[in-house]
Structure formats: structure tokens, C-alpha cells
């Protein structure tokens, strides 16, 4: 049964979420907002204090019994703080909601406070229509999903992402028979996504004063890294083109994400080492242990090719991909609900970004990514979503809940 969505209430809810700053590591107040929403809806509330100033907020609409439990999962942390020099003057990347020409703007609206608002409004719509579900319906608002990790001097909660909240969730009672994850998928059904392996490659060199470096440039680790980087660029197409690294027609991809060497405050010294950082995307069909072995074998080949450079490798992120069987009942439910609301069946997709489906699926919770658009393409106005799209997405979620929970 299709239930009406209160457009104004949905916009108000989403706006209240945007207005709460919730950069990774600072999600507490957003969690408190979710709790107040749950309590206003009469949901059972579970508060999970993940660490200081970080929490998960779980709300449960209890069923009458005998039906499957469905989880709506969404992360509260935003990809940016809005204080970055290149974003501070872009209005849609600030934690202040505003509406223009049928679109809702503000930091986090697409990734993924819009989905959280749709979950809330879907449950409210079911309640307003007097729908009683047999199975439990959970809303899990979690911290720490954004793709980042502690490394070197970058320490603290703001760097603890990669499903930190959902890993805590599933080990402290936040489990279900299946999960709908409203990441921004452009309304497509994502049957699987790649995982991420982060690799550091280090090259060593001499640490000497500029005055004594004449004739020793071949011992400068930055200049040595120039050669190693060229070898890495030769290797990247072999990883991306390897059939074992492809998934459902999508190739793997490797990003040269960072390079570090020397001291900007002391360039009177040659750098004793330089580091290159790679983001290597791994298909969900390849075990991370296998991927780790393969990339470190490549590092060993570099060490053999450049025997005087002291080449080393370290894998410091292994975040597996995830997939769901196309025949799963949740996929069928989303197909049917989407077609009812949008007038056609949703397209299939594979993505190379990471999501909390990685943690959830490994805890025995089949998880499907399906949500709104990315909303990140307006470089002048910033992050935004079409309000009509939010309304229809909330309506789709409500239909999915009825089909799954009974």
C-alpha cells in the first residue's frame, strides 16, 4: 500500500539534520537529534556510545511478530567539515540548510542525511496511515563511515572512519535479517561495490645538509621516488586490467593519492625517506588477503628493480567490498517499490566506492545500496538534492518496509 509522504515535514526534518555539524569524529549532537526524532515517533531507542563525542542512535518500530526484521542504515558523519579553504565560501557545503528552486541545499544532504530523513519520514508515513508491520523496522544512524583512517600524525576520532560505527553497531545488538542502505546511488540498485586497500611505498635516501649534497643527488629519496613512481604508473594498468580484479563488467581502479617526503620547514636537509600512498580498489569477489599478497609482491619487485633504494611496502587499510544476490527478496522488494513510485524498474549498478555494507554483510546481514542522487555536481552552490526526489525515495522506502516486514 502506497502511503502519502508529508513533503514539508520531510524538508523540515532533513533541514534540521543539515543544521547539526557532524564531521567525522563529532557525531554526538547529530545522534542526539536522531534520538529526539525517534522518541517523538514512539520508537524504542538504543544509544551506543562508540567513544567520547561519538555515538550510534538506533530506533526500532516494533512489529506485531512473525515477520523479518529490516534495518535502514545511514551514516551521520559528513565527508567535509565545510571549513576547508576551498569549501568555506560554497553555501551548499555549510551546515546551514536552504531551499532554492525545488532543491534542498546543505552539507551532508546527499551523503547521507537525505537518506536518514527519508527513513524517518517513511516510518512516520506508515504510522500516520495506521500500517502495522509484523517484523521490526530499525533505523540505525551511525558514526564513522567516511573513507579515512588514522595514519602518521593524523590521529584522533576525526580519522576513524571506514565503518567504525557500523562495526560497533553489529557487535552491540544492532542486527537485522537484511538492510537497506540509502547511499546516493542515483536511484539505481547497487548489487555490489568494490573494497579499498591502501598501500604505502617507502623509498630511503641519505639525510645530509644541502652544502654537502653535491654529487649525491642520486641518494635523494624524492628523486629516487620519481623513478619508483614511474614504475608504479607502469603497474597500475596491469592491476586495473586484470580480469580477476573486474566485477560485473566494472574494472578495478588505482589512485595515486598522496606523496610525502622531507620537511618544508627544513629544506636544508635531504629527505631520509619519501612515501607514496596508493588507493587500490579490490572487487568483492577477491579476498583481501589475496589482494594484500599481490600488491606486496609488486613492492618486492620494486625492491629488486631498485636494490639501492631500500624500497618497503605497508598495507594500512583493508576494507572489503560487498555484494548481494540479485535474487534476494530485498532486491525484489526495491524493484517492485521503485517501479510503483517511479513508473519503471531501477537500473543495476556497480560502484567503486566503499559503504557500510562491507561491515554489515560480513555480520550476516545482506545489504543493498539504493538511494538518491549524489547531489555534488554544483560546484558554485554546493551539495543539494531535488525535494521531489526525496519525497519519492521516502515513499519507496515505506513500500519496501511493507513488503519485507509484512
Region annotations inferred by a language model:
Residues 1-8, 26, 200-406:
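Metal-dependent amide/peptide-bond hydrolase catalytic core
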Residues 68-70, 102-103, 137-138, 177-180, ...:
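Structural motif
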Residues 83-100, 192-203, 333-337, 368:
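Acidic-glycine-rich active-site phosphate/pyrophosphate-binding loop
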